[in-house]
Each structure stands twice: as C-alpha cells, then as structure tokens.
Amino acid sequence: MAVVAAAAMLHPRAWTPVVSYGGELASSLTSSPVRVLMAAVILCAGAVAVLRRARRLRDVYLVDYGCFLGEPQHRVPTATATEHARLMPYLVDGESLDFMLRLHERSGIGEETSIPDSLRYMPPDRGVAASCAEAELVIFAAVDSALARAAPALPRGAADIDALVVACSFTTLAPEFADLVVNRYGLRADVRTVNLSGMGCSGALICVGLAKNLLQVAPPGTRALVVTTELLSSMFYPGTKREMLVPNVLFRMGAAAIVMSNSPERARFRIGHVVRTLTAARDRDYRCAFQVHVGEDPACINEGRRVFK
C-alpha cells in the first residue's frame, strides 16, 4: 500500500492543485501592484519591529536594599564628640573645636550617627587594620540586610548574583572590597566584579549607573549587587586647617547595598534616569576634594568650599 501511495503522489496530476494555487497567488499579486506594495510594507514593518525589540534596552529594577544602621555602642551624640575632642588638646585646639561645633550645628547631622571604634582611641587609630575592621563591619551588615530582604527573588541566595559593583569614596585596601564580598558570601566564579575608589561621594551614583548599564544589555533575569560605603578610620585629620577639618564633622560611618535586576518579578521600584555631570575639567572642581599628606600622617581629605556648591 505504501508503494501505491508513493506512486500516486508522484503522478503529475497529484500536484496540479498545489501548482495551480501557487500560480493563482503569484498571478494575483503580480496583477495588483497595490497588493504587492502592501505585502512589502507589512514585511518591512515586521522586520523593523523584530529588530527594535532585539535592540531595545531592558528596564532595570531595584529588588530590595539594606543599610548599616549601627549599634548603640557606635553612636556619637554631639556632647560625646565635644568631650572627646576637648580631651585631645594636642590634636585639636580650642579655635578649631569651636569651628567644628559651629559647622556641626549647621550641618543637620543627627544625634544617632555612628563612628568606628578606632576614632574613640586617644589618639585615634588610623592604621590599615582599623580600616579593614571598619570595612568588614559596615559592608557585611549592609549586604546581609539586602540579601535577607531580597530573599524571595534570590532562591539560591548569594549564588544568584551575576554582577557585583562596590565603591568606597576614598579608602583603597588590598585585597579590594569587591574581593572581600566575593570571599565572604561565596559568589560564583563567573561573577562580574567592579571595584571603584577615589570618586568621592558621587561613587554611589556611579555604581548604580554602571550596574544599570550592565543590566540593560544582559540576558533576562540577570541580578547585580551594588555596595557603597565610606570608611572614617583613615580619614581623620589631626590638625588645625579648617578646610581639612570639614570631613571630621560631616562624614559618618555607614554603608548601603542594593539588589538590582532586569526582571520586574518581585521588584520594588523601577530605576529611572541616572544623570551624572562631570566637571573635573575645571581646576576648581577638580580640587574640591583632594587627598593630601600631612607630615608623616596618612593621607587626609582637603575639602574646599567648592564642594558645597
């Protein structure tokens, strides 16, 4: 029976209806230029739609976040800071102390901000070990909080992180902070890491923009962990120059971590536009926050008035 069916299919008359239908279609299209034009327009529109969808940047979402809130022993009310400074006249004179108090009153800094234990010593401990201890304290607390809050979107926990971006305003250590996070949480071997330092307070915004750019072109479901921090242990200035006393007053211990994704599933917010204006080409802006050495002491931050404009 199979041989008979095959022979019947090979018979010329068996293909006549198909050929006839194809010929009628071609004849119909050829005989009507309008139909040909419409078919071409439809095909072009479909091709353009497919290309635009393939090249369109993906939306990026904030899944959740966590912050270092500090423990009661890290809090430093104004009265405590003032008393501590008065006990170190060999580092801070009365005129400099009055200047810092006036600046503190105008800054709006609350009574529950924190400083590291290294700055409670007399004189303060500004060594590398103190900076490492502070980094581990604030970074791990922020990341723990972010991963715990984002747990519903991370079935495997930290193993679901595909990219890591870490920034610290001025302090640089070895190994870098990104490697510190990778080692602590056992991130995958193929995780993409970026470590930024020396970009000042804008480092946090730069991290978010960098992670957003990465997620916009990554496959769906990609997740990034962004961590930003500021370390005070190595930034304390023991002197009387007012422009260098500003960081002693304005900066406090802290860190923040956010989990970002290009999938809206379980996300809390959609990331909007990230805008950054770079004015480092102007000397005034370039030197608004400068790291300098004071004698044999470690590097301190010189912040002029331009940084507040």
Residue ranges and their predicted role:
Residues M1-L57:
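Terminal signal-anchor or tail-anchor transmembrane helices
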Residues A142, A146, A163, F170-T171, ...:
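Folded extracytoplasmic luminal domains of secretory or organellar precursors
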Residues G157-A167:
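Short glycine-rich phosphate-binding loop at a beta-alpha junction
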Residues V166, L225-V226:
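Structural beta-sheet core signal
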